[in-house]
Amino acid sequence: TTGTNRLDSYTYDELLAFNLVDDFRAETNFKIPKFTDVLVWAKKNNAVLTIDIKRSVDVSEIIKVIKKYDAQDISIIITYDVDQTEKAYKLAPNLLMSVSARNEEELNRLLQTSIPVENMLAFTGTRLSDSKLYEDLHKLGIKTILGTLGNLDRQAAAKNDSLYMIWHNKGIDIIATDRPFQAASALKIVK
């Protein structure tokens, strides 16, 4: 945004004085939307949202809003630990969840819960994991997510974006990237 300081130091009305900036840091005419506005837009445009529920936010409040706007079918919630994931599942057993499964230990903790694997997308971190983890996740029917934001995106850019296909072939199903167009092109994804 064109604002400074922490977001939580402003009221929403004060935030409306700021504009969003684009990827090149150029000011746009767009204001900060409310979560409810984003849900309405996503439903209307058939867009899938990954909703990042930070630890300081009560997952029940977010799920209440998702349900109120009948947006369960376009919402994937990002959870950070087993407790948060279990709470989310109890509140909304039909929601798809991005769960932390960066190693076998985290995966085993998730498997010991009552959450069906059909509700899970496994976030495997921002570094490549051992191939065995991806194999184990796929055997369970769980899709994998690799966060290439930052370091891995820079590595891909330096290698003519060929790394995106290498990572996909290693077992990555979803790439969370700051370079979506380059990744899609490298993966030969066309609209």
Predicted regions and their residues:
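Metal-dependent phosphodiesterase/phospholipase catalytic core, i.e.
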Residues: 1-105, 117-118, 124, 138-140, ...
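C-terminal active-site rim and adjoining tail of enzyme catalytic domains
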Residues: 25-29, 100-101, 108-191
